[in-house]
Amino acid sequence: ESEKMVSEKHTQGRVNFWGYMYGYYFAPKRSYCATDDPEKEFKTFIKKLHQAGIACIMEMYFPRECNPVTTLRALQFWKLYYHVDGFHVLGEGVSAKLLMHDGVLSDTRLMFHDFDESQIRKKKKPEDKCIAQYNPGFLQDMRRFLKSDEDMVSAAAYHIRRNPNIYAVINYMACQDGFTMNDMVTYNYRHNEANQENNQDGSSYNYSWNCGVEGASADPEVEGLRRRLVKNAFATLLCSRGPAMFFAGDEFCNTQFGNNNAYCQDNIISWLDWNRLDEYKEIHDFVRFMIHFR
């Protein structure tokens, strides 16, 4: 089985909650909107983000059957029409070189899982770099370091100090495709039974440790250890040189109950449980402190 995180999802009659599919590249999703005018609403949304000093990075999926020129036109459209600041592009229909060399996208943040470094247009100043690599190696090695696997010190040191001059590396300990940060210290094994695929979907390589108990525990020692590990994970992530990304809800230990592939779960498995914000206020306050420290 491949260690790579899965990108293309086959719903087999279930809801495609993540939306990874071919097509509809030039229209905002109406069901996400509160009004009957999704174009105006999305434009207003972007404007409000910019007024608050927040950039908008869209994730878009282009499978093999998608023409790379269509990919280019889609990104140009969202940049010019909606003023989106950047894109995390997925799928085999993506030509990184075509996107990186396009004049319209020259100052746009572009994030890829892989690309040829020699094809990057170099900026005059390192701080102006706008090409980034999603860095699953950080997740894999730092999770192993966190749970004290052998011979991980040198790998951890490499990831902490890694910050290339001509492109960025996006460091993260969790994303939507895998365990949440809470679940990485709560489960040794995936629990994807709700996906109705006999628990065979999702990665088997989670680099997690349940601290001695599989799943939720009322033992204060187990719970205390898990909270310390989550704090260590955030401290390591936010003290590393590359840009840090964390999954929404990790700042208050949101759980997916061990499901590491919640692509078809439009329910409490993948929703954010905001009640945990009070229960895990200690973690939330620590994350805020670390962001300020960074």
Task: Label every model-predicted segment.
Residues 96-248, 252, 261-265:
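Conserved alpha/beta catalytic core and glycan-binding cleft of carbohydrate-active enzymes
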Residues 274-276:
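Long, K/E/R/D-enriched contiguous segments that form extended
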Residues 255:
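Core nucleic-acid recognition elements
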Residues 5-51, 64-81, 194-215, 266-269:
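Aromatic- and acidic-residue-enriched carbohydrate-binding clefts of CAZyme catalytic domains
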Residues 1, 25, 59:
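Conserved hydrophobic/aromatic pocket- or pore-lining residues that grip, position, or stack substrates
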Residues 45-56, 81-83, 236-243, 289, ...:
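A structural motif corresponding to the C-terminal end of an alpha-helix
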Residues 278-294:
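Catalytic cores of secreted or luminal carbohydrate-active enzymes
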Residues 40-41, 48-124:
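Active-site neighborhood of glycoside hydrolase catalytic domains
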